[in-house]
Amino acid sequence: LEPFYEIRWPDGSYFQASGDDEKMQSEVQRLNPADLPGYKRFLKDSQKRYIIGYEGMVAEPMHRLWETLKVLPTFAMLRADRSIYGLAARRVKDERLRMALSFHPLFIGGDPMHVTSIYALVAHLEKTYGVHYAMGGVQQIADAMAAVVRAQGGQIHQNAVADEILIKNGAAQAVVLTDGQRFDAPLIVSNADAGHTYDHLLRKHSRRRWTTGKLARKRWSMGLFVWYFGTRGTAGRWADVGHHTIANGPRYKGLLRDIFLKGRLSDDMSLYIHRPSVTDPSVAPAGGDTFYVLSPVPHLGWKNKVDWQKEMPIYRAKVAAEVEKLMPGFEACISTETIFTPETFEDRYLSPHGAGFSIEPRILQSAWFRPHNVSEEARGLYLVGAGTHPGAGLPGVISSAEVLSKLVPDAPVAQSKTRMAAE
């Protein structure tokens, strides 16, 4: 995509992220010319963190403590104890640029005020590889994976809810569904949230490390209010609203504090607007558009959690008022809609506390400190997905599968089927 995304502020200012160095420098200078030298230093910071944090760790197994210990000297040198916002604040003075350089961990469930500055690697990652979109939507990625499974002789059971993983003599033995069906297997891979895997699927098994108490003490990522809607006759309207738009509210640090530290649903908000149909018309009927608008909100683990059955229509109206500023008249064009709240994530995706991105990626909840891809609780049990290493977000989740491919023994596959999968 080009530009990658646009960030907007209430005062009408904006920042367009791009893969073009000159354009990026121009954007920085437009907001605050004095911050250009600091921005260039931040890019160097980002590259150093990319080398150790991405190339050295993301796709590598971290279930052995030594794998994390050996990078600690480099982490110390790079001041991984500082937050990504803290690093950005040391480099640039303009609060808008500080936000633009530090917000990325929000998209993997982390508070930029507290997650490690190692996540500054995203700037170099974007600069090197760009920002991409799978034509046809994320479903196309899932369908392609399913095609490989089936080509290798695998079966996929849909609308089948796992209720328990059976353990015998310290080894994973079988998966039992809620309808009583049982699937025996010498190896089991769980892509349920790690918290759900241990606290529910292994609830009858005595756990050594990932006990209910330990999981309860973890910091979980924020929840999400996600409003999906389609519109009629809007192709070509709101031309300044591209594929990815971030619309900031009046507060950055204060809003993050409410969400992550106080568990309070604020009246103000910052929104991410996704409009894939400007890139890929196939995802909407002719002449129409497909959108979703995402607002970070507290998860359900707080003492005074939000009652979303009551709050949803109220909050929808508040979100609509903000979207109206970007896309005047949009509500009259809506043809279909659905809304996900943290309760949806808890009920539909079995996510603890309705968290959108599983365990928050703080430094002591990352790498070896995160639930391991190789479970300690039972031989032959493996974990994949947002709750394990390397973490949440589409790149992280797919990378966790790459990590697992280095750990799970290969299953025998007929040569003809292997060839089909490769093709």
Regions found by a protein language model. Name each.
Residues A386-P409:
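A conserved FAD-binding loop/helix module that cradles the flavin
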Residues D163-P285:
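Mid-domain catalytic core of redox enzymes
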Residues P10-H114:
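Rossmann-like flavin
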Residues D94-I108, S266-H274, K325-P390:
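A glycine-rich dinucleotide-binding beta-alpha-beta segment and adjacent secondary-structure elements
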Residues R232-D347:
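C-terminal segments that line or cap access tunnels to active or ligand-binding sites in enzymes
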